[in-house]
Every structure is written in C-alpha cells, then in structure tokens.
A protein has these predicted regions:
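A structural boundary/capping signal
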Residues: 1-125
Length: 125
C-alpha cells in the first residue's frame, strides 16, 4: 500500500490511472539473470564507446553477441568496434550480416557506406 502511494504521482503523470491503471506487479516484475547481465553489459558498452576504449568495447560486444544471439544490432556494433581496431575482415563479415538480415534498418545506408569503405581497404592491401 505504501509503495502504491509513492507511485501514484508517477502513474498520474504517465497516464496509468483509471481505465489504463496497471497492477503494481507489472512494475515489479523480476528480471531474469540474462536481462540483468545484458543491461550491465550494455551499460559498460555505452561507457567504453563514449571513452573510445575500443579493445574493452570489443570484449563487451563479444559477450553481448553470445548472450543475445538474435540481437543483430549487437553484431553490427561488434563490427563497428572491430573496424575501429583495424580488424577489417571480421568487421566486414559482421556488417554484411547486419545489412543482409535487416535490409530495412534505419541505419542501412550508413552501415552500407562503411562496409564499402572497409571493402575498399581490403582490396588495397
């Protein structure tokens, strides 16, 4: 009851009152170990990306790809980290997989342009 009273102002502000009111349990759902770990890794990912710590970021991306095998954006992001570290061929593989699997992605053209640039680098070596 006390928790519900503390939440009421927030619920009012978000429009979750009246006919749209959700039971308190909906807000207190237990997170799975996978959800907790992926949240932790994504927080580290944001930190390392912001700090441009590419080697550490790559380690996080490797873990995210394993933990979330269906999350193709994590494969894309691993490819971007690989490119920053000049691991061109694996970066190309990841980016190609991303655009092949998500041809309607909002960043398709940007990733495709980076992919073309990386493929040019391979041809010149």
């Amino acid at each position: 009851q006390e928790l519900q009273e503390m939440l009421d102002p927030y619920l009012d502000a978000q429009g979750y009152r009246g006919e749209y009111q959700l039971p308190l349990a909906a807000f207190l759902r237990t997170a799975s170990a996978r959800e907790i770990l992926s949240r932790y890794l994504r927080n580290l990912k944001a930190i390392y990306s912001q700090q441009e710590r590419w080697e550490r970021l790559l380690g996080i991306q490797q873990r995210l790809v394993i933990l979330l095998p269906d999350a193709v954006e994590e494969i894309r992001d691993r490819g971007l980290a690989l490119a920053q570290l000049d691991y061109i061929r694996p970066a190309v593989d990841d980016m190609r997989r991303y655009i092949d699997e998500v041809p309607d992605a909002s960043d398709f053209e940007e990733i495709q342009a980076q992919l073309i640039e990386l493929e040019q680098q391979i041809k010149h070596h």
